[in-house]
Design a protein with these regions (language model features):
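Positively charged, polar, low-complexity stretches
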Residues: 2-97
């Protein structure tokens, strides 16, 4: 049985939006030129992501100032998940903590 490729995104104690995007870039192994914004995240999910599962850790450690950013991230991930379904591809994400 083939195992799913899983990406683990650890946001524990992330303090700045730039740091959040750098952790995304590293977790997904996006290129250095990743634009560090939600449009760039969407673009690279569609073109560079071969993961079938994303586990997100550490959201509960973020300050309230990140609430809107996390909602935007979840929106982009949900769009990507739905886009994958159209092409019979699998992508799911789970917020662990």
């Amino acid at each position: 049985m083939e195992s799913k490729k899983t990406v683990i995104l650890d946001l524990t104690d992330c303090k700045y939006l730039g740091e959040l995007h750098e952790r995304i870039r590293v977790a997904f192994d996006f290129p250095e030129w990743y634009g560090a914004n939600w449009d760039a995240f969407w673009d690279l999910l569609r073109s560079e992501c071969d993961a079938e599962k994303l586990e997100i850790k550490g959201i509960n450690t973020l300050s309230k100032e990140f609430d809107n950013q996390i909602e935007t991230m979840k929106y982009v991930l949900e769009m990507f998940k739905n886009n994958c379904k159209k092409y019979d591809e699998i992508f799911e994400y789970e917020i662990i903590s």
